[in-house]
Regions:
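Substrate-binding cleft/loops of secretory-pathway carbohydrate-active enzymes
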Residues: 259-284, 304, 331, 384-387
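Short, electropositive alpha-helical surface patch
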Residues: 158-177, 263-277, 389-401
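Boundary/entry segment of secreted carbohydrate-active catalytic domains
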Residues: 58-105, 109
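Substrate-binding cleft and catalytic face of glycoside hydrolase catalytic domains
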Residues: 71, 101-119, 127-254, 258-260, ...
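Short, acidic/polar
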Residues: 86-102, 129, 180-190, 264-276, ...
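Acidic-and-aromatic substrate-binding clefts and catalytic sites of carbohydrate-active enzymes
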Residues: 84-96, 114-127, 212-216, 220, ...
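Aromatic-rich peripheral "rim/lid" segments of glycoside hydrolase catalytic domains that contact
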Residues: 61-69, 118, 161-162, 190-194, ...
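Secretory targeting and sorting signals
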Residues: 2-56
Length: 416
């Protein structure tokens, strides 16, 4: 789908240049040029002959329902699973239509997390995940389950015994392991009850999520000092994967992490994976979240893909939470602490264009690395659904996804 025009003539208005990433970074063309590219691509998408594209293409934004499906565009490049994070509130209406058209896989954004499924010990609520399973069934989609064990959305009771925080005593370790097993077993039993023939749409699972800290902290592999770690140490990851394999033997088991384009974090991440494999822990896939920013170095994402392949060519790989932020924090590569930031560009059109050019680099890399990637998942169906607009993050200027707040095709889409 890539059809980006050559540099416009001087008479074409150009956008403010992006902050320099390095000397090799290509100069950014003007916004008018990107709009021209969108017009030409629109004409192609709706079947207008190339020679008449400029005359026939509409001047207004093109609805996402009228353009080529991303699952076909990236599928033609060799990506089998083209996914989207979605919530149970999106199973009907225009969001459902857009998702069904463009994606062949989906990730539950929150419905698979422990606080949604087991908010109180022994009381399970599968209503949200069931809606998503039904949606996947109805539209022939696969589910990438996310995520049984992640501290920020694991309820507090998981780590307490009669109000007392669990320690690393043998008794407390046994209690936490028992709770981990009860949780995984309940999910597996519920899925099995819905799919007694074993034909569940769940093809993969993020077993653990974000276990590596952003800098040295003295723990093995700089693992985060969470209650999971304080009670079980590094072995909590072993326990999680062994339980997942026991109860979901046919599902591909992934470990998921953010900021994997950082060389130091890459070293910690792959060091942990290497040790897990040496202990014969059933890690089958390695994911890069890829919440990136305007100055992120796409080559560092590629370097991590190559490093995983060098570690073990049998490991599956996924880009699991793709979006492109345009805040000052995102521009410095910090994908976790984005609160109280400001936009890089004050003009929304400039933001959209800059994000589009990052996606162009991303899609080029994804095509080149398609043989190493099992899955690419966008973290939201459109810009009205992005986590970056949530009250806890509060960055309304961000336009991180291929489709806009009205589900129109954005420059990020045309870059595909």
């Amino acid at each position: 789908m890539t059809l980006i025009p050559r540099r416009p003539r001087a008479s074409v208005r150009t956008a403010p240049s992006l902050p320099d990433r390095d000397a090799r970074r290509r100069p950014r063309r003007g916004l008018a040029a990107l709009a021209s590219a969108a017009a030409v691509l629109t004409a192609v998408a709706i079947g207008v002959p190339a020679g008449s594209a400029s005359a026939a293409a509409p001047s207004t934004p093109v609805p996402g329902m009228q353009v080529s499906a991303l699952k076909d565009v990236l599928g033609d490049a060799g990506i089998e699973h083209v996914g989207v994070a979605m919530g149970s509130g999106e199973v009907q209406g225009t969001s459902a239509d857009l998702i069904a058209r463009h994606f062949n896989a989906m990730t539950p954004e929150n419905e698979g997390k422990a606080d949604a499924i087991q908010p109180v010990e022994g009381r399970f609520d599968f209503s949200g995940i069931d809606k998503l399973l039904d949606f996947a069934d109805a539209h022939g989609m696969k589910m990438y389950f996310h995520v049984p064990y992640w501290k920020p959305q694991t309820p507090a009771w998981f780590f307490l015994d009669n109000g007392r925080p669990l320690t690393n005593s043998p008794a407390d370790q046994a209690l936490l392991k028992a709770r981990m097993e009860a949780h995984m077993k309940a999910i597996a039993d519920h899925v099995a009850s819905r799919y007694p023939k074993g034909n569940s749409p769940i093809w993969a699972m993020d077993v653990v999520n974000e276990v590596i800290d952003d800098g040295p902290n003295g723990n093995p592999h700089d693992m985060k000092d969470t209650p999971f770690f304080r009670v079980l140490g590094e072995g909590f990851v072993d326990e999680a994967f062994q339980l997942a394999k026991k109860y979901f033997p046919g599902v591909k088991l992934f470990i998921n992490e953010y900021n994997t384009d950082s060389p130091s974090k890459r070293a910690d991440y792959l060091g942990l994976v290497s040790d897990l494999l040496k202990r014969h822990i059933p890690v089958e896939g390695v994911s890069q979240q890829s919440h990136i920013g305007l100055r992120s170095d796409i080559e560092e994402l590629r370097n991590t893909i190559h490093a995983v392949k060098a570690l073990d060519p049998n490991l599956l790989q996924a880009i699991s939470e793709l979006d492109v932020g345009a805040s000052q924090a995102a521009a410095t590569g910090n994908s976790e602490n984005r609160n109280h930031t400001a936009p890089i560009y004050s003009n929304p059109d400039d933001t959209a264009a800059a994000v589009g050019w990052v996606y162009k680099d991303l899609f080029t890399m994804i095509r080149q690395e398609a043989g190493n990637l099992e899955s690419v998942t966008f973290w939201g169906s459109d810009n009205s659904r992005t986590w970056l607009h949530s009250p806890s993050i509060d960055q309304p200027w961000d336009q991180p996804l291929p489709f806009g707040t009205h589900q129109e095709a954005m420059p990020a889409y045309w870059a595909s």
